[in-house]
Amino acid sequence: MIIGIPKEVKVREYRVGVVPAGVVKLVESGHQVLVQQGAGIGSGLNDQSYHQAGAQIVANAEEIYGRSKLIVKVKEPDESEIELIQENQIIYAYLHLAANPRLTQQLLESKCIAVAYETIQQPDGSLPLLLSLIHI
């Protein structure tokens, strides 16, 4: 599967969907990983570290969304990203859909498969992705 890691566009969002160590594991599992140029800069991760981990660095979000089956983000897509989402593309991010009916409708209309981190539940009922990302 081709997995895309776009640069976050939300103001003051410096995290990135996957760190280089995660890219290594994905590549070792047979996936191709595309990382948007500069995606990790806000987290202190440069493009070279992603390249060394096995990712291909691409210039822009259009290429990430255009080539990837799975998009891994931190925050919900904004208006500029919504128009890039393709039918049956998997979007994995904190979506906060209860607070944003417009985004919910836009994702439904795009016919993507949207997975909200905050709704992933363990068998014991815990919500592990509501912990700090440092623990995940």
Task: Describe these PLM feature segments.
Residues 2-110:
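An N-terminal-biased, well-structured beta-alpha scaffold segment characteristic
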Residues 120-132:
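Glycine-/Pro-rich loop/turn segments that contact NAD(P) or position catalytic residues
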Residues 108-123:
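Acidic-glycine-rich active-site phosphate/pyrophosphate-binding loop
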Residues 134-136:
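Conserved small/polar residues in nucleotide/adenosyl-binding loops
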